[in-house]
Amino acid sequence: MDATYWGRNFGVLLIVDAYRKRLLWRKFLDKKETIADYLEGIEWLREHKFKILGIVCDGLWGLPQALAQYKVQYCQFHQVKAVGEYLTKNPQTDAGKELQRIAHLLCHTDKESFTGMLEMWYEKWGEWLKHRTLDRKTGKKSYTHQRVRSAYFSMKRHMKWLWTWYDYPDTPIPNTNNILEAINTDLKTKLRIHNGMSKRYRKLFIDEYFRLKYK
């Protein structure tokens, strides 16, 4: 499940059956999605007797914890993307470059190898991450390498949910939301042709798109 947006004030939240590639539930959004929006969709599935084997989601703060009763997989693609946003495409430090290489292996390796590489990286750079710089104007200290810290601790914080698919091999849980990403990309491409469409007609277009393609 994931949300996609057109600007800040219009989006749609989707829940898709990853293996049947079937749209199960959707909700139009007029603002940033909340945990309550996702829980509304989960409750709808429960009310309609769907068996929830697992849930793949992105990094909305607190969402994995709110879904603790289920097997939750944090989308590995979103995690790599988040690290890239912190480090940029061209990290300026050796630590950042090494961490970027490790992050890019996330979707292509196993749990033990990845966690081992990340632990070795921290053993090498952990003290470096603690460096602080004094701001002479304010007299306050801040972390010198904040972006690299944020990238590392983002992976560390989500580690519990990055390998659910691996920890439960008998449960068919994808490791990414790539199916939803493909749907969102296709939908946005088609809507781009009709740029300038009002919100009302955009909703009608999206409803018809899903009716025809994912009925």
Task: Label each residue range with its predicted role.
Residues 50-61, 67, 100-215:
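Acidic/histidine-rich catalytic cores and adjacent linkers
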Residues 23-27, 37-42, 49-52, 79-82, ...:
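Glycine-rich loops and low-complexity Gly/Arg-rich segments
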Residues 54-100:
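Conserved beta-strand -> loop -> alpha-helix junction used to position metal-binding or nucleic-acid-contacting
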Residues 17, 32, 93, 194-196:
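A short hydrophobic/aromatic micro-motif that marks alpha-helical segments and, especially, helix-coil
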